[in-house]
Swiss-Prot record:
It comes from Opitutus terrae (strain DSM 11246 / JCM 15787 / PB90-1). GO terms for molecular function: ferrochelatase activity; metal ion binding. The lineage of its organism: Bacteria, Pseudomonadati, Verrucomicrobiota, Opitutia, Opitutales. This is Ferrochelatase. PANTHER family: FERROCHELATASE, FERROCHELATASE, MITOCHONDRIAL. Keywords: Cytoplasm, Heme biosynthesis, Iron, Lyase, Metal-binding, Porphyrin biosynthesis. Its EC number is 4.98.1.1. CDD domains: Ferrochelatase_C, Ferrochelatase_N. Catalyzes the ferrous insertion into protoporphyrin IX. Belongs to the ferrochelatase family. The keyword S-adenosyl-L-methionine does not apply. It is found in: Cytoplasm. It holds the Pfam family Ferrochelatase.
């Protein structure tokens, strides 16, 4: 067996749309201290497992029912397709494994297989273009913790957030360009939200985020861990590549929880505002998601469209994520080849 391999890690999905399966998934997901990080224990566990998850599970199960396919979860299906296509592109000398941060296949079980297969060098590619403690960071921490437990000798290299990588932007443009070419009035870039507090928590200097005027547009080393600055950078790069007019596109944030301020403006509010302002034809793009999932297929394509149309909009199009399209497979393959070449030196 080859001694070098690739590990793709995505978010995950419930095993089914049943309330017990969804509850089990949410218990693991929302129980992650990097997703919901307060209050202090034991109160956080009580809040998550006795209040939030029981209340959310039935509604979340219904939402999953709206997007579930005969083959199961769209995110899992697409992630497997990415794994298979990347493996076919790289060839048998570089196996590609797939794990989910929450649910199955778990990071622990997949790393067990990697160790059993005799892999000594591993390239970890979190399926997140941007840094956030609740997405990219939790994947990396979990993989390194599990690797240290199962295989201390395993050498793990991690692909850093690629939010402004020219090849990533080109892949986004290749998939989005046919939609940009269609008649439309406005493009809304909708990114997954995070608590504002998480931005400040990620600022190791404690002197920039929410302190410096226009902090996300003021160059700083702390942008290496600033989710908001990174999504702005993605938006600027893709808008420039596509030639989008500055007054015909903007950024919003979706998927917020209640209880504290999250990044704004909120996507549902923006869809309503834009429709009431006379925007009739809107394109919605979700670059933080590499694979279409609950947040794009239900929250945007179903609920978002309903919000926009009810407020007076007429044409609503959610531009698909990169999914398993050739430009994204090529992007991943190039990242792997760069690593393979570097590890030969």
């Amino acid at each position: 067996m080859p001694n070098r391999a690739v590990l793709l890690v995505n978010l995950g999905s419930p095993d089914s749309t049943s309330v017990p399966d969804v509850r089990r998934y949410l218990d693991e997901f929302l129980g992650d201290e990097r997703v919901i990080d307060r209050p202090a224990q034991p109160f956080r566990s009580i809040l998550v497992h006795r209040i939030i998850v029981p209340r959310r599970s039935p509604n979340s199960a219904h939402a999953y029912e709206q997007i579930w396919t005969k083959d199961g979860s769209p995110l899992i299906i697409t992630s497997r397709n990415v794994q298979q296509k990347l493996a076919a592109t790289l060839g048998p000398e570089t196996p590609v494994y797939l794990a989910m941060r929450y649910g199955q296949p778990s990071i622990a079980s997949v790393l067990g297989q990697i160790v059993a297969d005799g892999v000594s060098e591993l390239l970890l590619i979190p399926q997140y273009p941007h840094y956030a403690m609740s997405s990219w960071e939790t994947v990396v921490v979990k993989v390194y913790e599990e690797a240290a437990r199962q295989a201390p000798q395993l050498r793990v290299t991690t692909v850093q957030p690629f939010f402004d990588d020219a090849d990533y932007i080109e892949a986004l443009h290749a998939v989005s360009a046919p939609y940009f070419a269609q008649p439309h009035d406005y493009v809304l870039f909708s990114y997954h939200g995070i608590p504002v507090r998480h931005l400040c928590k990620a600022d190791s200097s404690h002197a920039h985020c929410q302190i410096v005027n226009d902090c996300c547009n003021t160059p700083s080393p702390v942008h290496a861990t600033c989710y908001r600055a990174q999504v702005f950078a993605t938006t600027r790069a893709l808008a420039a590549r596509a030639g989008l007019a500055p007054d015909r596109h903007s950024v919003s944030f979706q998927s917020r929880l209640v209880g504290e301020p999250w990044l704004s403006p909120y996507t549902d509010h923006e869809l309503e505002r834009l429709a009431k302002a006379g925007i009739k034809r809107i394109l919605v793009l979700c670059p933080a998601f590499l694979s279409d999932c609950l947040e794009t297929l239900e929250e945007i394509s179903v609920a978002g469209k309903e919000t926009f149309v009810q407020a007076g909009g007429e044409s609503f199009t959610q531009i698909p994520c990169l999914n398993d399209q050739p430009p994204f497979i090529d992007f991943l393959a190039n990242r792997v080849r760069t690593w393979l070449q570097a590890s030969h030196r």
